[in-house]
Curated annotation (Swiss-Prot):
This protein's encoding gene: rhaA
Pfam family, one: RhaA
Catalytic activity entry: L-rhamnopyranose = L-rhamnulose
Family in the record: Belongs to the rhamnose isomerase family.
Cofactor dependence: Mn(2+)
Keywords: Cytoplasm, Isomerase, Manganese, Metal-binding, Rhamnose metabolism
InterPro entries referenced in this protein's UniProt entry, alphabetically: L-rhamnose_isomerase, Rhamnose_isomerase, Xyl_isomerase-like_sf
SUPFAM superfamilies cross-referenced by the UniProt entry: Xylose isomerase-like (SSF51658)
Protein name: L-rhamnose isomerase
Entry GO MF terms: L-rhamnose isomerase activity; manganese ion binding
Function per UniProt: Catalyzes the interconversion of L-rhamnose and L-rhamnulose.
């Protein structure tokens, strides 16, 4: 009771300080509670999945480390996810990849059906979660010569076209069963290691293959598709078919969401600067919040400048309504549940920081060229008691405050993870 009283006292002081500059903390907390983060399942097992967990991870990505306790079964993964969600304020979504089938049947990617994901749906209902989806265009023998949908081999293309079509039905099933729109994100790692002669033809093949995948009209109440670009991957350093320009053109002309992954661009290029432009011309955005360290390394999201800027862009420009926020990182050198908790809570914190700005006043100052006041206030805000508002948010949502969550993760590691 003592800690609760202290948290509440500190919040009341913070509330008054923010009120003095025209910020309503109660409104900010209500807005934050309604924002769902799509937490990715693949942090829990280092992107192995359950279709062929002993196979090679391909597609130009890499999970490094060998921290004990990775999930080996759907049941273990769900158990770990439940622990993570219990430490994160609010109700959210889970982002599944197609390789995370939960079935006793022997199925391939071009054979998957909604029934192979029914245990995930039943679990999501119990937990009050939504489900997003991703077809898996990697870690499979039909990922041939670094190509899937853009392959010159029709047999390879047809296999992956069928996989894409089936993934749409699964995403639709999620939306119908759970009453939340399921975002189905298409990332295709096709590319070439060294400089190609023909950049045009593979892109034409990819465009035509995607058109075939998306030919059937599905109700967007249940599922919406996003398309995700990438600059390069391991083994595809010189050329990736699905570049930013390709998918921006494809998404805008085909009425698809544009997925921006924080690690899929040049090292000095940031996705925060792209959001306002995409908001003007595209249907909407799917975010993969990640942290690239010199390349698309998929480090756990920390409270760095870019994460703060992403939050600001979404809030300042009123883009939350057209943005689906997902996470994409996988670090096998640390406790995987801690990775989820740190990344998700940090993403929420970045949004709260932005929600606690006097945005309308700052915009007015900027419009009137009062850059002095703009600078003074934004700098002073850095010393405002944001942490007290965040702690109160955790408290009223029934999750651990401060580092208390780490104690629970350590205990879970001792009781569960180290016994696997």
């Amino acid at each position: 009771m003592g800690q609760e009283t202290e948290i509440n006292k500190r919040y009341q002081v913070a509330k008054e300080r923010y009120q003095a500059i025209g910020v309503d903390t109660e409104k900010a907390l209500k807005t934050l509670k309604d924002i769902k983060i799509s937490m990715h399942c693949w942090q829990g097992d280092d992107v192995k999945g359950f279709l062929n967990p002993d196979g090679e991870l391909t597609g130009g990505i890499m999970a490094t480390g060998n921290y004990p306790g990775a999930a080996h079964t759907p049941k273990q993964l769900r158990q770990d996810l439940e622990k993570a969600y219990s430490l994160i304020p609010g109700k959210h979504k889970l982002n599944l990849h197609a390789i995370y089938v939960d079935t006793d049947e022997k199925v391939d990617l071009n054979e998957i059906e909604p029934k192979h994901f029914t245990p995930w749906v039943e679990w999501a209902k119990e937990q009050g979660l939504g489900l997003d989806f991703n077809p898996t265009f990697f870690s499979h023998p039909m990922f041939k010569d670094n190509y899937t949908l853009a392959s010159p081999d029709k047999e390879v293309r047809d296999f992956w076209i069928e996989h894409g079509k089936r993934s749409r039905k699964i995403s639709e099933y999620f939306g119908k069963e759970l009453g939340q729109t399921s975002i189905n994100n298409f990332w295709v790692p096709d590319g070439i290691k060294d400089c190609p002669i023909d950049r045009y033809t593979p892109r034409k093949r990819l465009m035509e293959a995607l058109d075939e995948v998306f030919a059937e009209k599905l109700d967007e109440k249940y599922t919406q598709e996003a398309v995700e670009s990438k600059l390069f991957g391991l083994g595809a350093e010189a050329y990736t078919v699905g570049s930013h320009e390709f998918y921006m053109g494809y998404g805008i002309t085909r009425d698809k969401l544009i997925c921006l992954d924080a690690g899929h661009f040049h090292p000095t290029e940031v996705i925060s600067n792209k959001l306002s432009s995409l908001a003007l011309f595209s249907k909407g955005v799917m975010l993969h919040v990640s942290r690239p360290v010199r390349w698309d390394s998929d480090h756990v999201v920390i409270m760095d400048d870019e994460l703060i800027e992403i939050g600001r862009e979404l809030v300042r420009n009123d883009l939350l309504g057209i943005t689906n926020i997902g996470l994409d990182f996988f670090d096998a050198t640390i406790n995987r549940i801690a990775a989820w908790v740190v990344g998700t809570r940090n993403t929420q914190k970045s949004l709260l920081k932005a929600l606690l700005e006097p945005t309308a006043d700052l915009k007015k100052m900027e419009l009137e060229n009062d850059f002095t006041s703009r600078m003074a206030i934004t700098e002073e805000l850095k010393d405002f008691p944001f942490g007290d508002v965040w702690n109160y948010f955790c408290e009223i949502n029934g999750v651990p405050v401060g580092l208390d969550w780490l104690k629970e993760v350590k205990a879970y590691e001792e009781d569960v993870l180290l016994k696997r």
